[in-house]
């Protein structure tokens, strides 16, 4: 299975004080143990990780620190990681995308699908996305 990790997954995984850190870390750990799993990032979720990381701490985490944390996260994925180039235009959105707040979700969902991947998220309400489970079974 191939997953594109969205901003919510990256932020929860990257910061141990996040309410969903353990859930996300467990899912990523299980995914890494599965032989046929690829975990993708792209520029939009990576930029979102840096932005949210700085904003959620009121600037106590700097852009440089957030970038360094992200680099460590990507390195931890090892051979399971692929950086997905964003080759999709942002001119059409599905019917469920009726507010500006959902445009990035819709774009990432289409980007993932166009490359044979599934968008992995902690956000409910994204039709067709994979919502990380609250409990991860042994082995994933």
What do these predicted regions represent?
Residues 1-41, 56-68, 137-140:
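Short, well-structured N-terminal submotif of metal-dependent ribonuclease cores
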Residues 12-14, 52, 129:
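Residues that scaffold the ATP/ADP-binding catalytic core of kinase and kinase-like folds
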Residues 30-31, 73, 111, 136:
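Hydrophobic helix-cap positions at the C-terminus of alpha-helices
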């Amino acid at each position: 299975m191939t997953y594109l990790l969205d901003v919510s997954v990256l932020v929860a995984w990257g910061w141990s004080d996040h309410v969903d850190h353990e859930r996300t870390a467990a899912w990523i750990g299980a995914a890494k143990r599965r032989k046929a799993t690829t975990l993708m990032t792209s520029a939009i979720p990576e930029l979102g990780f840096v932005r949210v990381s700085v904003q959620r701490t009121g600037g106590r985490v700097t852009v440089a620190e957030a970038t360094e944390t992200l680099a460590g996260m990507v390195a931890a994925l090892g051979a399971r990681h692929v950086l997905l180039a964003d080759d999709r235009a942002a001119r059409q959105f599905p019917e469920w995308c009726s507010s500006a707040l959902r445009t990035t979700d819709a774009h990432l969902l289409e980007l993932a699908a166009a490359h044979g991947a599934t968008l992995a998220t902690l956000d409910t309400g994204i039709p067709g996305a994979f919502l990380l489970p609250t409990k991860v079974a042994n082995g994933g």
